[in-house]
């Protein structure tokens, strides 16, 4: 998305007495991993006007000014009765303060945990708060009777869905959303951004799939014609398909053979941001993630999860030279459970010295735990490159666990089918991709021309590859085609295990393509590509891309071919 477009607010009727206010950012809003596709985002708020008026989910501070201007042109704030919260977030507090100045009569409607958060955020104010535990309703008049469904999760302990009986709209807050900005208010062209919906799920929902399943169960009895989501296009055309997809994706997470507990607490949100990036890497690596926010989890919940998983990571900030109480409690439970056959890891954000991380690592080491990663210390707020590094750390941790499991399985001889498939050959290439400051590359031989007009190709990429998260529709990459004779050095180099964040091209002479991706000076030829679409195929993604540019560098050379004897590995 272009950075040149200013932020704005779309206002549109979506049902009887109901409007959406979509605050739009065309560029990347924040550095959190869920925004990494750089499609922009929308923060959707809603207005229901019965005999009484309610707004749902006013946005964060960065949208506050333009949102309040649009809201005042939409409703008379002196007659605003309710502000309904799908979740509580500290970066919404300035918006709440501004609303209270403009409409001091408002009553906040929220879950019970959010009520406590509001009172803590406004200790000197006697706020009007109406907590919803799940059985209450709110009658706005003119048929708009609202039902409330608490949907807590480790990321959003105060989660709450709202259902309007008359319009049959379910206000889902974080569920079913996508971080994408455009002119389409509804999802009528949902096929064009379904990968954004999947990426959003992988980042935000996969680490607590069991809570997603619980939420789906709660809404299953409702007659719903529209999901009024918190981010992205409102869901109507793909409602049934997306609901089923959420169920399938959640089940797939739960059914994974290997699982990891991700225990964390966060002082300023930075350690939680790191945890989400690691969780995405773990998910890509093929393990189930059980995300546990230690500030809200009970000791029994922590212990039960620790007993069930194959490995765990503990994330902690350092506050006054120490770990916060919830982390000390969790660490005590880890040491009490005492199963040092489980793979361990430590991570966190710190401001000055990070003593908490050293303390946690030391106690785990003294207890005999093996570590699946070097303790990951991030100073202050992670940037885009750091988050990509954290994602790769998670993938490496997952692969280490999976290798440990495979050791116990005897190596099987290739079957006749695998031997036959192994005779399918492909040109040896190095695929490079770049997005912002993040750059990476991989060896690939599962490459094939796919179309004449436009010129296009397909490339198969394993799900756990670091480059995978840069290969979404709209992404750019370069395909470096290698020559017969000089390809073996590249194959040896790119087949090794790279450390997270390691420069893949440090030993080679390179230039930069017009699209910003790395070109190997010793390549036979290269083509610059734009990802058009991708298809999930078992343990790989098949990416179709159109060719934008290219150059033959060595006209007299012959393309290197990768000859194999089995189709069960590269």
UniProtKB/Swiss-Prot annotation:
Domain of life: Bacteria
Source organism of this protein record: Nostoc sp. (strain PCC 7120 / SAG 25.82 / UTEX 2576)
Region (Zinc metallo-hydrolase): 38-231
Residues covered by the Flavodoxin-like domain: 260-402
Lineage: Bacteria, Bacillati, Cyanobacteriota, Cyanophyceae, Nostocales
EC number(s) per entry: 1.-.-.-
Cofactor note: Binds 2 iron ions per subunit.
UniProt keywords, alphabetically: Electron transport, Oxidoreductase, Transport
Note: By homology with NorV in E.coli, may be involved in nitric oxide detoxification.
Pfam families found in the cross-reference section: Flavin_Reduct, Flavodoxin_1, ODP
PANTHER family (alphabetical): DIFLAVIN FLAVOPROTEIN A 2-RELATED, DIFLAVIN FLAVOPROTEIN A 4-RELATED
Identification of the protein by name: Putative diflavin flavoprotein A 5
Enzyme class name: oxidoreductase
MF annotations from Gene Ontology: electron transfer activity; FMN binding; oxidoreductase activity, acting on the CH-NH group of donors, NAD or NADP as acceptor
Cofactor: Fe cation
């Amino acid at each position: 998305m272009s950075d040149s477009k200013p932020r704005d607010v779309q206002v549109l009727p979506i049902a009887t007495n109901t409007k959406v206010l979509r605050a739009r950012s065309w560029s990347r809003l924040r550095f959190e991993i869920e925004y990494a596709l750089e499609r922009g985002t929308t923060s959707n708020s809603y207005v229901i006007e019965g005999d009484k008026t309610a707004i749902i989910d006013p946005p964060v501070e960065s949208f506050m000014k333009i949102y309040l201007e649009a809201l005042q042109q939409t409703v008379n704030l002196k007659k605003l009765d309710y502000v309904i919260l799908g979740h509580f977030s500290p970066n919404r507090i300035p918006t709440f303060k501004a609303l209270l100045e403009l409409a001091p009569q408002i009553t906040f409607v929220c879950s019970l945990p959010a009520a406590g958060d509001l009172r803590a955020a406004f200790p000197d104010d006697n706020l009007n708060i109406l907590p919803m535990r799940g059985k209450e309703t709110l009658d706005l008049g003119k048929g708009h009777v609202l039902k409330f469904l608490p949907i807590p999760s480790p990321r959003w302990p105060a989660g709450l869905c709202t259902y309007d009986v008359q319009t049959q709209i379910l206000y889902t807050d974080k569920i079913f959303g996508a971080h994408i900005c455009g002119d389409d208010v509804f999802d009528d062209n949902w096929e064009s951004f379904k990968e954004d919906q999947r990426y959003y799920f992988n980042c935000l929902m996969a680490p607590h799939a069991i809570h997603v399943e619980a939420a789906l169960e709660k809404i299953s009895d409702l007659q719903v014609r529209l999901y009024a989501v918190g981010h992205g296009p409102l869901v109507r055309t793909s409602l049934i398909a997306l609901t089923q997809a959420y169920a399938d994706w959640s089940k797939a997470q739960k059914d994974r053979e290997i699982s990891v507990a991700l225990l964390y607490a966060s002082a300023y949100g930075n350690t939680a941001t790191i945890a989400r990036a690691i969780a995405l890497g773990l998910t890509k690596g093929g393990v189930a993630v059980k995300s546990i926010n230690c500030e809200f989890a009970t000791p029994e919940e922590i212990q039960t999860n620790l007993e069930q998983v194959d490995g765990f990571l503990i994330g902690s900030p350092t506050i006054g030279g120490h770990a916060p109480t919830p982390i000390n409690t969790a660490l005590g439970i880890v040491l009490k459970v005492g199963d040092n056959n489980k793979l361990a890891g430590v991570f966190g954000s710190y401001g000055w010295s990070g003593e908490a991380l050293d303390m946690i690592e030391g106690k785990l080491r003294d207890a005999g735990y093996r570590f699946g990663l070097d303790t990951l210390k991030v100073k202050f707020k992670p940037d885009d490159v750091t988050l990509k590094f954290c994602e790769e750390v998670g993938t490496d941790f997952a692969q280490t666990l999976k290798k440990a499991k495979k050791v116990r399985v005897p190596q099987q001889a290739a079957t006749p089918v695998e031997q036959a498939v192994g005779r399918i050959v492909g040109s040896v290439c190095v695929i490079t991709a770049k997005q912002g400051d993040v750059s990476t590359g991989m060896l690939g031989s599962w490459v094939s021309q796919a179309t004449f007009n436009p010129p296009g190709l397909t490339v198969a990429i394993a799900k756990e590859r670091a480059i995978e998260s840069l290969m979404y529709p709209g992404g750019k990459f370069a395909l470096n085609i290698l020559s017969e004779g000089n390809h073996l050095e590249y194959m040896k180099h790119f087949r090794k295990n790279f450390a997270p964040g390691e420069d893949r091209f440090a030993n080679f002479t390179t230039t930069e393509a017009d699209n910003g991706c790395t070109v190997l000076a010793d390549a036979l030829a290269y083509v610059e590509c734009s990802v058009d679409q991708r298809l999930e195929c078992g343990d790989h993604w098949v990416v179709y891309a159109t060719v934008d540019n290219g150059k033959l560098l060595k006209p007299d050379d012959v393309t290197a071919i990768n000859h194999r004897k089995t189709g069960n590995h590269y």
